[in-house]
């Protein structure tokens, strides 16, 4: 889905991802 792709792009820009490509902190988009 596009939402998942957008989250991945957001995480790449911010640089805050875990090994699953998800946000690694509660204050970030998940």
UniProtKB/Swiss-Prot annotation:
Transmembrane segments: none annotated. This is 80 kDa carcinoembryonic antigen-binding protein. One of its GO terms (cellular component) is MKS complex. Binds to carcinoembryonic antigen (CEA). May play a role in the development of hepatic metastases from colorectal cancers. Keywords: Cell membrane, Membrane. The lineage of its organism: Eukaryota, Metazoa, Chordata, Craniata, Vertebrata. It is found in: Cell membrane. The N-terminus is blocked. The keyword Isomerase does not apply. The keyword Heme does not apply.
